[in-house]
């Protein structure tokens, strides 16, 4: 079990390193003025080819844009859970460690998004309402892949009913697949921008899950030691 958890942490770090390398490659490999208004696009040959293959589908873009509210609502629900624990237990230190870590995890993802909004790597392949918008990493894809796995993870931890857990698992898989594929074929992002979101969000989630499980293990070990001391 310990070996599996260690490999999970390593996988998370590797994915974050891959995201950093991917970002550098996009800035320096096959850069062409292939975007709207002549904006520079990295790995342009592949990006332009895939964009022409899928075309632009604004209906899919609009649907996935509105469905982006779902993970936001889920974040708010976890926030309410943490606040309820804080009010009831009257100390931040008594809030469940996995919820505190979840809040920190969401903050890190938000900061990453804001950073790339301020320092654009790629712009969208189309203008939105006549304006250029940053596209890397895809914000909606990042939001979905950051939040939805945590819904399944928290459900597995907190819900005893296996039917409800299974229903949540199916919902998470179907919703996530629809959103990622939808953004991919909608034509509002370059394919490299979707790939960047997948790598970043996956790496962050694996590290979050490792840390949450590690806190649980330490807590269990501490309780066992205290119990042995009492005996």
Question: Could you describe each region identified by the protein language model?
Answer:
Residues 2-135, 141-168:
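Hydrophobic alpha-helical bundle signature of multipass membrane enzymes
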Residues 2-10, 25, 128-231:
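Membrane-embedded catalytic cores of phosphoryl/pyrophosphoryl-handling enzymes
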